[in-house]
């Protein structure tokens, strides 16, 4: 049997040990012969630390998986079967700017929502599309599995602006939501099924089942009563307004707090901002501690401290997806794919996050039809933001970027949109070559 070749771009990421653990665990059904970890020269030291740990993990497990490290992406991609992307263009320093600049204007500063999400997309999409061009030449049959944030917007750009059709976006949020529901009901997560539909970081659980019996109202009652947190590591856990959750009647995701509890979330962020600690700084500290652990030549497993990063279950989700495509499992997973009519009211060529049957030919979305009226509008508004943002990222069109910023529901005015856009274009200009010389004439820096 010819083994499988997986290439992970952004291989020096602190998440990589989880990916390696997931591949080791599945070796019987998913025989990975080569795992190539690719990074850029600036990330070389981290790549070497993570790579050495990966080799120790593989050796301890006794599986014949070769770990290759390189900063030459094209060398790695030749004849790959699966390519995963987990890149952060501009590293965490760029994330800190994405969070801090909007807060200066009294606007939510967050990695994947609002102005921060827009700029992360503007920096990341051109790089991902470059990777797509390499894939087209060097491994045209490979599956691209992206978990760089904002995952939905990046999948949207790949589907609409690259010739690659074998592309899937992946997020750990649906798994995290399922784990949370299991915790609320005090049962094992594999007994829970949730019908997910929406967009990335804008996904709803339309129905919740325990052993095949509908328990949606029971779960919403538990969430409404404030008995247990329903959020993720990086999002504060405010009490939901009980009657609102009951009226909504479906399960929101943790990121919906930015839209339904904007004031509380902003106040909380501003407190941190004034103390000079945003989420990016917290993560920078966590990363430092993780890499100290990874350096230890005696460490040969994934350290439990990795769970503190918001991305727990990410890599496990990736391994499950690869396993199901490779083995034509036809199980149900929640991924970002081309809509093709699965959700009415969203363009067919747009990315949606939805339950899919995973086959050897990729994910097949399970149609849900119309989303409930009270949430349909927000989802469509975010989709029009994403489509406009993707176009701005590809064309470097200043006015398209301004439009994307202004129509985002977290941005309070056209004037604030322009000020933030100009300041963030300047702050990130080293990572935004497509916008060269296109800033508006009267931008004041």
Regions found by a protein language model. Name each.
Residues 59-68, 190:
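A short helix-to-beta-strand connector/capping loop
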Residues 17, 143, 147-212:
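Rossmann-fold dinucleotide-binding core
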Residues 66-79:
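Short acidic low-complexity segments
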Residues 186-445:
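Long, compositionally biased stretches enriched for glycine and/or charged residues
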Residues 6-31, 35-38:
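N-terminal Rossmann-like dinucleotide-binding module
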Residues 78, 84-85, 146:
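Redox-cofactor binding/interface segments in oxidoreductases and associated redox assembly factors
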Residues 26-62:
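Glycine-rich phosphate-binding loop and adjoining beta1-alpha1-beta2 segment
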Residues 89, 93-161:
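Rossmann-fold NAD(P)-binding glycine/threonine-rich loop
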């Amino acid at each position: 049997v010819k083994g499988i070749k997986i290439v992970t771009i952004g291989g020096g990421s602190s998440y990589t040990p989880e990916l390696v653990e997931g591949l080791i665990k599945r070796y019987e059904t998913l025989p990975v012969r080569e795992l190539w970890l690719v990074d850029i020269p600036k990330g070389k030291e981290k790549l070497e630390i993570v790579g050495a740990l990966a080799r120790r993990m593989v050796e301890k497990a006794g599986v014949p998986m070769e770990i290759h490290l390189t900063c030459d992406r094209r060398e790695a991609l030749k004849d790959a079967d699966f390519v995963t992307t987990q890149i952060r263009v501009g590293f965490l320093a760029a994330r800190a700017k994405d969070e801090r600049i909007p807060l200066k204007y009294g606007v939510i500063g967050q990695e994947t929502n609002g102005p921060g999400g827009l700029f992360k997309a503007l920096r990341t999409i051109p790089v991902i599309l470059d990777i797509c061009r390499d894939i087209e030449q060097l491994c045209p049959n490979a599956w691209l599995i992206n978990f760089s944030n904002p995952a939905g917007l990046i999948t949207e750009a790949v589907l609409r602006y690259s010739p690659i059709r074998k592309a899937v976006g992946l997020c750990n949020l649906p798994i995290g939501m399922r784990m949370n529901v299991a915790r609320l009901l005090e049962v094992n997560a594999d007994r829970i099924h949730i019908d997910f539909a929406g967009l990335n970081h804008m996904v709803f659980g339309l129905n919740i089942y325990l052993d095949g019996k509908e328990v949606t109202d029971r779960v919403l009652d538990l969430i409404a009563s404030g008995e247990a947190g329903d959020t993720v590591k990086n999002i504060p856990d405010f009490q939901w307004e009980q009657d609102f959750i009951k009226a909504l009647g479906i399960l929101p995701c943790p990121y919906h707090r930015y839209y339904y509890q904007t004031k509380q979330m902003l106040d909380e962020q501003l407190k941190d901002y004034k103390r000079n600690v945003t989420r990016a700084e917290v993560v920078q500290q966590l990363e430092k501690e993780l890499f100290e652990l990874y350096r230890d030549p005696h460490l040969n497993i994934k350290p439990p401290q990795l769970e503190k990063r918001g991305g727990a279950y990410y890599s496990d989700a990736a391994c499950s997806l690869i396993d199901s495509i490779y083995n034509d499992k036809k199980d149900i997973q929640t991924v970002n794919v081309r809509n093709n009519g699965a959700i009415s009211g969203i363009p067919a060529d747009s990315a949606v996050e939805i339950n899919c049957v995973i086959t050897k030919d990729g994910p097949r979305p399970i149609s849900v039809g119309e989303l409930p009226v009270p949430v349909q509008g927000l989802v469509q508004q975010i989709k029009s933001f994403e489509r406009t943002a993707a176009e701005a990222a590809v064309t470097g069109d200043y006015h398209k970027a301004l439009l994307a910023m202004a129509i985002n529901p977290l941005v309070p005015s056209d004037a604030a949109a322009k000020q933030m856009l100009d300041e963030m274009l300047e702050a990130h200009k080293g990572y935004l070559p497509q916008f060269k010389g296109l800033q508006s004439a009267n931008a004041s820096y």
